[in-house]
Amino acid sequence: MVISARDFAKLESPERKSLQNIDDFLGLVRSLRWRTCADIGCGIGFYTLPIAQQWRNSRKIIAVDRSTPALEELDKRVDSLELGNVQILQTVSDRIPIEDASVDLVNLGNVYHEVKGRLNFLKEIYRILRPGGTLLIIDWDPEEDLGIGPPVSDRIPRDQLLQNLEFAGFTDMKDHFVFVGHYTYTAKRPIKR
């Protein structure tokens, strides 16, 4: 899904904010070792902005999306918050415009179910992660239908995600509870393959 300006209200609705408590998310991010984070499918910055604010003086955030309106809105918000640690990139292909092995953490928040060619997408994330780097993936759980979010039929089962992570080369998959109605996993790019 490419985000348009009419989607902005839904992306930051009170319902979403109550379901996805950003402090719980930041607690998990705080527990991980990283200096540079790529937020893939960043939209208008639901995850990007809190990460950048929390670590404004010490860490870099690369925000990546396909949507021009979303990135323009994110750029305005970054400017208004005076966040000098955010780099905004637009992708127009299946290749993420980030150098090989250059980030320590990749965040995928409510994005994976939208992706076509999921295995190739995970291989692309593997490419940009440094050896030892972490993928953090949060997505809608098909086993918990709360009446919001994408249709259950569009959601990716946990076992399918875990299988794709393994096929893409990731190891050390760990399940974390962060948000109701979602699953959350971290996975590592191994130091040696």
List PLM regions with ranges.
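Conserved alpha-helix/loop element of class I SAM-dependent methyltransferases that forms part
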Residues: 16-36, 50
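A short glycine-rich, Lys/Arg-flanked "PGG" loop and its adjoining helix->strand segment in the class I
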Residues: 119-134
